[in-house]
Structure formats: structure tokens, C-alpha cells
């Protein structure tokens, strides 16, 4: 059997062995991935999703209750602040209207002449005020909060639906790709698909490694190394011979029979 036939037989056996190992591994990986994808799809489909009506009812009643309580609290706060301001203004009015009389009484009690109070006059109080609170503001904020919750739920529902759709599309595309390979390349299409996707770049390196470990591969490597050394030695010899012939030519060109050596 020739050297080429040995190399071809070795490569063929290596490819068959590596292909069978990779094919079995990828088939198992494919089965595991299919089972995992199916479980994930079932889990996604069985996830409890609250209904929109329940969310709307909870958000609406909660918002209405919060708005009503805030409205009543604001009205009560306005009433309390108004009562405080009214009592303060009543006190200021009473003090201002009795200022001269109280001054005279104080002078009498002090043993002084009450006529000293004639130069005084009643004061003008500044009054009292409060900052009222708009009771409708709390109700409006509660209504806006309810609307925001509805929109947030719609966004979450859309994102969940999009995620389910993407998962389903990934499974469908994967199954379609495998079926296309099966249909186009026969019973080895599935293995070819996974091999092309995951192991296509590993096979050349594996084959080269196995070839280098085989006796034939070691012989080929040694032959290549010897050829490289011989080629390098031949190049050096050729260069030396060229240098020798050039030196002889220069020597002959400088000598003349009739005139002798030229300087």
C-alpha cells in the first residue's frame, strides 16, 4: 500500500471516529435543548397572569378611596385653619377696642392721673390669614395615579406577551432549521446542522492534531523538516559557488598577458 493510500485511509478513519463522537454528543445536546425549551415554554404558558379587570378594579377603588380621604382631609384642614384665623382676628379686635380703657384702668391702679391716657388712641391690628389647600388637587393626583397604573399594567402585559412570542418564535425557527437540514441533506441533516453551527471550526484543528500524533504524520513532519534543512543547505552552497565564480572572474579581468596586472 502506497504512502498516499495510508494517509487517505488514516484521514478517513479519523473523520469517521470524530464525526460519530460529535454526532452522538450533538444529538444528546439537541434532545436536552429540546426538552429544556419545551419545559420553558410550558412554564411561560402556565405563568399566572392577573386579569386586567382585577388590576383596574384594585387601582380604581384604591385611587378613589385615597382621593376621597385626601379631599376630606384637605377640607377639614381648611376649616381648622380658618377657625384659628378667625379667633386670632377676634382677639386682635378685642384688644384694639379696649386699648384706651385698659390704659386708664392701669393708670388708676398705679395711682396716677387718668388724664395721662388722653394722648393714646386705639391700635389697628394687622389681622390673621392662612394658606388654604385645594381639596380637588388630591383627587386629581389620585386619578392620574390610577391612569398611570393602568398604563403600567398594559406595558407589562405587552412586554410579557412579546417575551412569550419571542420564545415561541425561537423554538419554531430552530425546529424549522433542523427540518430544512433534514429535508435537504437526508438523515444526517440534523447532525450536519449542529456540526456546522458548533463544531465546524474545531474539526480542522482536531484532524491536524490526530495526524501529527499518528506515525504517518510524524514521518511526514520529519520529512518536511529534512526537506527544509536540505533546501537551506543547498541555498548556502549555491550562494558560495556564485561567490567563488564571481571572484575568479574578477581575478581574470584584472590580469593581462602583455601588460601584467592592472591596478
Curated annotation (Swiss-Prot):
Q: Which GO terms describe its biological process?
A: symbiont entry into host cell
Say yes or no: keyword Transcription present: no
Record's family?
Belongs to the microviridae H protein family.
Q: What keywords tag this UniProt record?
A: Capsid protein, Host-virus interaction, Viral genome ejection through host cell envelope, Viral penetration into host cytoplasm, Virion, Virus entry into host cell
Query: What is the annotated role of this protein in its UniProt record?
Result: Probably triggers with protein G the injection of the phage DNA into the host upon conformational changes induced by virus-host receptor interaction.
The protein in question is named Minor spike protein H
Q: Name one GO cellular component term.
A: viral capsid
Q: Look up and give the organism this protein is from.
A: Chlamydia phage 1
Query: Where does this polypeptide localize?
Result: Virion
Chief location: virion
Amino acid at each position: 500500500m502506497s504512502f498516499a493510500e495510508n494517509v487517505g485511509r488514516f484521514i478517513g478513519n479519523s473523520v469517521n471516529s470524530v464525526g460519530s463522537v460529535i454526532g452522538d454528543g450533538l444529538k444528546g445536546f439537541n434532545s436536552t435543548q429540546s426538552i429544556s425549551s419545551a419545559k420553558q415554554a410550558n412554564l411561560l404558558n402556565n405563568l399566572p397572569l392577573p386579569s386586567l379587570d382585577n388590576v383596574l378594579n384594585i387601582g380604581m377603588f384604591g385611587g378613589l378611596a385615597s382621593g376621597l380621604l385626601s379631599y376630606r382631609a384637605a377640607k377639614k384642614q381648611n376649616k381648622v385653619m380658618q377657625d384659628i384665623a378667625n379667633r386670632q382676628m377676634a382677639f386682635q379686635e378685642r384688644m384694639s377696642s379696649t386699648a384706651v380703657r385698659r390704659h386708664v384702668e392701669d393708670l388708676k391702679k398705679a395711682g396716677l392721673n387718668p388724664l395721662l391716657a388722653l394722648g393714646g388712641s386705639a391700635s389697628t391690628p394687622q389681622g390673621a390669614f392662612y394658606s388654604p389647600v385645594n381639596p380637588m388637587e388630591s383627587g386629581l393626583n389620585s386619578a392620574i395615579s390610577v391612569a398611570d397604573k393602568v398604563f403600567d399594567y398594559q406595558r407589562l402585559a405587552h412586554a410579557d406577551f412579546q417575551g412569550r412570542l419571542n420564545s415561541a418564535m425561537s423554538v419554531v425557527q430552530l425546529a424549522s432549521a433542523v427540518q430544512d437540514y433534514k429535508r435537504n441533506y437526508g438523515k444526517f441533516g440534523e447532525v450536519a446542522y449542529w456540526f456546522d453551527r458548533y463544531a465546524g471550526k474545531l474539526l480542522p484543528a482536531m484532524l491536524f492534531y490526530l495526524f501529527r500524533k499518528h506515525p504517518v504524520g510524524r514521518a511526514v513532519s520529519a520529512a518536511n523538516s529534512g526537506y527544509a534543512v536540505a533546501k537551506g543547505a543547498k541555498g548556502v552552497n549555491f550562494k558560495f559557488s556564485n561567490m567563488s565564480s564571481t571572484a575568479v572572474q574578477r581575478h581574470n579581468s584584472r590580469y593581462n598577458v602583455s601588460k601584467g596586472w592592472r591596478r
